[in-house]
Every structure is written in C-alpha cells, then in structure tokens.
Amino acid sequence: RNRAGAPLNPIANLRLAEGEAMVHQMRALIAANLSLYEADDSQTSTTDRMVSYNTLKVSASALVIRVTEIALRICGIQGYMEDGEFYLSRHIRDAHSAMVMVNDDRILGSLSSVVLGMPITRDV
C-alpha cells in the first residue's frame, strides 16, 4: 500500500482476483466429475460420463493456461528471470503441454460427433 492507503498495483489485484476465480472454477469442475465418478447412478449413461470427463480435460487445460498467463501479467518480466523467486517459465511450458500432449482438438473432434448424436434430455 502507498502512503494514502491505496493498493500499490490495483490492476495486479484485479488479475489476482481473476486468477482466483478461475482456480475455483477448475476445482468445481473437478469436484463435479469426482462426484460423477463416485456416484452409483444408473441414470447417468456411459456416454454422459465420457462427455463429462473429456470436457473436464479440455476445460482444465484451457484454464491452467489462462491462470499461468495471469500470473505472468502479475509478476511482469520477473516471471522470466530464472534466478528470481517469481520464475514462471516452467509453469507456462507445462501448462501449454497439457493442451498438446493429449491433443484437445482431437478430444473435441471426438466429442462433437458423440454430442451431436445425443438426445437433449440432460440438465444444462
């Protein structure tokens, strides 16, 4: 805080709140899929489960990239300094690898044909 009591970097504070919201979103996605996995629910089809799990993977890989980008914007150039305490290059690289290692486009391509053939009877 400065002498007037205002935050030193209000934009960084906004980015921090944005990143925190995305982390909560990711946790909610994981919790929902964990509940689906643990549920002994005969009403949920195998196809619905597959769509949900694959959507989790695609969503999580996009969210982790966005969260690391926000962290870099907060840290600034210090995020690239290898000897600094805010070094983020490895985290950024690892975040991008999630989208590439098991290709999200391939997953979405498979999902599109499955989802297009599903009846719209489930909750939105």
Features from the language model and the residues they span:
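Secondary-structure capping and boundary motifs in well-ordered enzyme cores
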Residues: 8, 15, 52, 56-60, ...
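Glycine-rich phosphate/cofactor-binding loops in nucleotide/flavin-utilizing enzymes
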Residues: 78-124
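Generic structural signal for well-ordered, non-transmembrane alpha-helical segments
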Residues: 17-24, 54, 58-65, 93
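Amphipathic alpha-helical coiled-coil segments
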Residues: 63-71, 98-105
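Extended amphipathic alpha-helical segments enriched in small hydrophobics
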Residues: 1-40
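C-terminal helix-coil-helix/basic helical segment that borders enzyme active sites and/or dimer interfaces
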Residues: 25-59, 72-82
